[in-house]
Amino acid sequence: MATATVRPAAQRLRLLLSPLKSRICVPQAEPVATFGTAVTSAKVAVNGVHLHYQRVGEGEHAILLLPGMLGSGKTDFAPQLQSLNKKRFTLVAWDPRGYGYSRPPDRDFPRDFFERDAKDAVDLMKALQFKQVSLLGWSDGGITALIAAAKYPSYIRKMVIWGANAYVTEEDSRIYQGIRDVSKWSEKARKPLEALYGYDYLAKTCEDWVDGISQFKQLPEGNICRHLLPLVQCPTLIVHGEKDPLVPRFHADFLLQHVKGSRLHLMPEGKHNLHLRFADEFNRLVEDFLQ
């Protein structure tokens, strides 16, 4: 029984992290240049920390890209930074505090860490003098996007989310526990993130993330942000990969039911990393929705 339980978790882990192994690299500080077709990077002081971001494009429509667990703008959104329309959009891909290049501080996971990320994200974009923004949120970044849209409705124009969930189930908890020990990950899954963070930081942060996300299971109905969904006012596109082994379809259906006026787009061959595996299709979908 133990073997049967561990194997699916390991498979899910590989599916989660495998898209990063060919794209992830250690972020390098890049010179700030004229915003346009060249991706630039910088840091800005927000809420007592220095948040790192990448920026590209010169369009009127500002878009913030929000990465997933242990992710960063550079590792999670390369195809979007490269290929989304630079004349129509200005793209900003951020590293949440404690992730990527937004260190120090080390990442921690108090119960309100998603709310903290949402405030950081909005305040970052305000510090960059954007009057209003749209959100692209993957996985944990999708949860952060939902909270930001609910709490700052006048600031968010539109939102695209995928791989997100508003609550935690027993099934989710089993998946989380299966990835706690990074020494049990495959080398292909571990090495790229180890190059980004170093082994000790990666191992500790992964354990802390599992504890942080698992604490929601102790709340009524496993609540992360389900109580905030009725407050979302912006047009919302939910994208779900029908072969996603990490986030079951019922999470997308729940969001569709509780986010007023939202739309659900299913990708039959999509998995958790659908925006990387099917980048061209995903980018077209995003551009059509945000126009």
Swiss-Prot record:
Record note on disruption phenotype: No obvious phenotype is observed for Bphl knockout mice. Valacyclovir is rapidly and efficiently hydrolyzed to acyclovir in vivo in the absence of Bphl.
Modified residues (N6-acetyllysine): K74, K86, K119, K126, K191, K217, K243, K260, K271
Domain of life of the native organism: Eukaryota
GO cellular component, one term: mitochondrion
GO terms (BP aspect): homocysteine metabolic process
Chain residues that bind Mg(2+): E221
GO molecular function: alpha-amino-acid esterase activity; serine hydrolase activity
Site (described: Binding of alpha-amino group of substrate): D140
Sequence similarity: Belongs to the AB hydrolase superfamily. Lipase family.
Name of this chain's protein: Serine hydrolase BPHL
Organism listed in the record: Mus musculus
Origin organism lineage: Eukaryota, Metazoa, Chordata, Craniata, Vertebrata
